[in-house]
Amino acid sequence: MAPIGRYSDGPHVRWRVSIQGTCSHVIAADQRPDAFLWVCMMDIAVDQGFLRQRLPSRDVSATRALDRYDPAYDPLLSPTPGCGRDYAPTYWIDTAGEPPVDDGPIDSDREVDVAIIGSGFTGLSAAIALARDHGIRATVLEANRVSWGCSVRNGGQAQCASGRLTRSQWIARWGLDTALALHAECLDGMEYFKRLIADIDCDVQPGGHLYVAHRAARMPMLEREAKVLREVFNYDAQILDADTLRRHYIDDHEAAGAMHEPEGLGVHPAKLAFGYLEKARALGATVHPASPVQGWVTKDGWHHLQTPGGVVRARAVGVATGGYTSQTLHPRLRNRLMPILSNSVVTRRLTPEEIEANGLRTHQVITDTRVLRHYYRLTPDGRLQIGSRSAITGRGAPDKRYERMLLDGMVRKFPGLRDVSIDYSWWGWVDVSHDMMPRIVQPDPHVAIYYALGYGGNGVMYAAQAGRRLAQWIAGAGGSLNLPIFQGQLPFPNVAGVITSEWFAPFRRLGQRALYRWYHLKDEVL
């Protein structure tokens, strides 16, 4: 028997232990090791007696606590993201310091008012808002370690956006009035985000967002969008020509110019997530890692959430699982998302001479105009972080060719970094909706289930606002939320945006492969 994790339990200290390396258990420090509750899905014997208890099992392998992270995990194939898996080996986790204390795994049956599934930016933001604004102390359930998913695997770019559509596309889809209201929602979200993180030490890098034209052919689009932003939305977006961009911002060798947006921040995602965790617990929320929801039954107005350590009975459930939403979590979520893999690398620390030679003159967050976009920035400690598309499937994610593709993109932008070593490389799943916009909704007004999903890679900032809106819904104050992102449900897959049907779901990845080829042609050739 060996201790593999420690957490607080009020005045007590508890240890998570492994026996024969097969499953995880929770015991109090003063408890006899032959009389503890086995928190695993198998036959058990208690206190040297012959009491045998059979617990329902869905995924025995998912009950191993603090297992190494699974690089080939795939949300379309795996019933859960695991149980107690360690973090991906990202730059953010390596430089965030020790994670704050949490509340340990669920270790008994319990009744709660509100359960939140997922402890990333959205889930923790919802727990904060529920406690602070509505007096509700949520119970947050996390399959692995706190904020284990893309909340600690992203690029740390807090942009004034929600979903993947431009403001011009909002106008085309919903009309001017709705587009203006959506813009106001994003601005309000950015201000809320700034207030929320004001006392969190998360390496904030202000300065706005640079949207770089990676080819001259993309400059007219940026010029049109900047004009719409200024004249229609009263948002001070400015066009930078290639010379101005290189002299004052960044010497990206692909860049033909850029659009500068006034709102945009760089943050350290793991430090931000850990700050949210501390805020949520300080307000009375409880956050339980290694507690995946392995079964969900609704009966007589109660939601019975089966975890390895016990059943959580909740009056209301908020889902904030992002790109790690399994197909089997709940029928209302099945086939509603398209999980997309994104790769990221971080170089070794660059010398001041290397930074100068490569024209890295700003710490602003940057994306380019590719459909399969690159996102990049200089970190506070002088490294280049850059990310872009990855494999189609989890099984393909560890293939080094995707890292090489990303490094080729980096070298096209900054040839002087060709021989610079890479200290960190990882990938994560992004929750993309089938219409490129998120939903923060109660899909059935008669059932207390709510979700906030589908940010499409723009969740660093908006997840804070989405968590607040999710809390409004859960607290019964969501009636005033009347924008399209607060109504209906996430749509099923579609063909060319015309025909929508769940029948297309089995062919999503075939379509993704075809789209990636088409997007490559649009980005690099046409």
Task: Cite the ranges covered by each PLM segment.
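Active-site substrate-recognition segment that forms the wall
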Residues: 156, 199-206, 310-312, 316-353, ...
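N-terminal glycine-rich dinucleotide-binding loop that anchors FAD/FMN and/or NAD(P) in oxidoreductases
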Residues: 156-175
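Helical element adjacent to the flavin cofactor pocket in flavoenzyme catalytic cores
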Residues: 259-302, 306-308
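Extreme N-terminal leader/targeting segments of oxidoreductases
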Residues: 17, 21-23, 35-112
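C-terminal catalytic lobe of FAD-dependent flavoproteins
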Residues: 44, 394-396, 404, 408-514, ...
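N-terminal Rossmann-like FAD-binding beta1-loop-alpha1 element of flavoenzymes
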Residues: 114-139
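Glycine-rich FAD pyrophosphate-binding loop
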Residues: 133-153
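Rossmann-like flavin
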Residues: 170-279
